[in-house]
A protein has these predicted regions:
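Glycine-rich hexapeptide-repeat left-handed beta-helix
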Residues: 1-13, 45-61, 65-66, 70-75, ...
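Extended, small-residue-rich solenoid/repeat segments and analogous flexible loops
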Residues: 1-35, 39-41
Length: 137
């Protein structure tokens, strides 16, 4: 469901797809050929969420922002099932594994992989083509 929050209504490219049970709220921009799958919550109430082209946000994922940090997801990104992203940047061509959590001010460089169940703590910056896995990274 697309929902307005304050003066912001989500902008979804006409070639993107949103599952009927997904909640897409507020200041969100979703690019061409991207998809948001079942039971996802994308909530841009305090800052913007930007999703590039050909990106997929899989079932049960949660994407939020911080007052000081937008959440930016590049082109050709896969966000696997049950991922949580909060106020971070995921550059182009990345894979974020199932149940990973990525917190505020993190930058995942283009072409990187974050392993399933990983916890990436605030402020970490990873160069392109990184392999990131584990907890308290």
């Amino acid at each position: 469901m697309l929902m307005k929050f304050k003066n912001f209504y989500p902008k979804v490219n006409k070639k993107a797809w949103i599952a009927p049970s997904a909640d897409v709220i507020g200041n969100i921009d979703i690019g061409e050929n991207s998809s948001v799958w079942f039971n996802c919550v994308l909530r841009a109430d305090v800052n913007a969420i930007k999703i590039g082209k050909c990106t997929n946000i899989q079932d049960l994922s949660m994407i939020h922002t911080d007052v000081d940090n937008q959440t930016i997801i590049g082109n050709n990104v896969t966000i696997a099932h049950k991922v949580m992203l909060h106020g971070c940047t995921i550059e182009d061509n990345c894979l974020i594994g199932m149940s990973a959590t990525i917190l505020d001010n993190v930058v995942i460089g283009r072409g990187s992989i974050v392993g399933a169940n990983s916890l990436v703590t605030s402020g970490k910056i990873f160069p392109p083509n990184s392999l990131i896995f584990g907890t308290s990274i």
